[in-house]
Amino acid sequence: MSTQDSAKITTVEHRRNIYLVGLMGAGKTTVGRQLARRLSRPFFDTDHEIVERTGVPIPTIFEIEGEEGFRRREAQTIYDLTAENNIVLATGGGVVINPENRRRLHDTGWVVYLNVSPVLLYERTRHDRNRPLLRVEDPLAKLEELHSIRDPLYREVAHIVVDGSHLVASGIVQYLLREFNRL
């Protein structure tokens, strides 16, 4: 990408942020890092930020504070990071549960929904022990349930929806760069 293209994306829409939403394992962090690098923007990941702020892993937060405590921390992190300019942010999969998070994301940046089938998400996450919501007897059923609940919320907040089931991260980044230049 040329410097001119990067400058165009940077200045359009008054220096809007780019937020990636989707279920765990959708590729938000991988795509976000590559996109930030291509646009010369800082990259943040809400889960990483929460771990940095608390000094403990996400599963520990879930064990001590429950999902409700984690969601409060996530909402504060979203509030803080959406005040930044020109960042790329990979959000946690449940960020859209909170209506205020959805409003802040939609109003302060371009929201990209990486939609991936629950079966593929299961393949990507089945060996990952840092996913508290998947510590259940049937993780695939849990992913299907989460997808059915959250998909409408992701679509509500998204400016761009990408089917991430059939594209590698670099292909998604190329697609997004073209889309941002059309906005």
From Swiss-Prot:
Keywords: Amino-acid biosynthesis, Aromatic amino acid biosynthesis, ATP-binding, Cytoplasm, Kinase, Magnesium, Metal-binding, Nucleotide-binding, Transferase
The protein's required cofactors: Mg(2+)
Subcellular location: Cytoplasm
Keyword Nucleotidyltransferase listed: no
Keyword Transcription listed: no
Pathway as given in its UniProt record: Metabolic intermediate biosynthesis; chorismate biosynthesis; chorismate from D-erythrose 4-phosphate and phosphoenolpyruvate: step 5/7
Reactions accelerated catalytically: shikimate + ATP = 3-phosphoshikimate + ADP + H(+)
Residues at which substrate binds: 47, 71, 93, 150
PROSITE patterns, sorted: SHIKIMATE_KINASE
Amino-acid positions noted as binding Mg(2+) in the UniProt annotation, renumbered to this chain: 29
Superkingdom assignment: Bacteria
Cofactor mode of binding and number, as noted: Binds 1 Mg(2+) ion per subunit.
Any one of the GO CC terms: cytosol
InterPro entries xrefs: P-loop_NTPase (IPR027417), Shikimate/glucono_kinase (IPR031322), Shikimate_kinase/TSH1 (IPR000623), Shikimate_kinase_CS (IPR023000)
Binding site for ATP: 25-30, 131
GO biological process: amino acid biosynthetic process; aromatic amino acid family biosynthetic process; chorismate biosynthetic process
Enzyme Commission number: 2.7.1.71
Gene Ontology molecular function terms on file: ATP binding; magnesium ion binding; shikimate kinase activity
Main enzyme class: transferase
Known function: Catalyzes the specific phosphorylation of the 3-hydroxyl group of shikimic acid using ATP as a cosubstrate.
Record text on subunit structure and interactions: Monomer.
PANTHER family: SHIKIMATE KINASE, SHIKIMATE KINASE 1, CHLOROPLASTIC
Family per similarity comment: Belongs to the shikimate kinase family.
Protein name per Swiss-Prot or TrEMBL: Shikimate kinase
Organism, as annotated: Dechloromonas aromatica (strain RCB)
Name of encoding gene: aroK
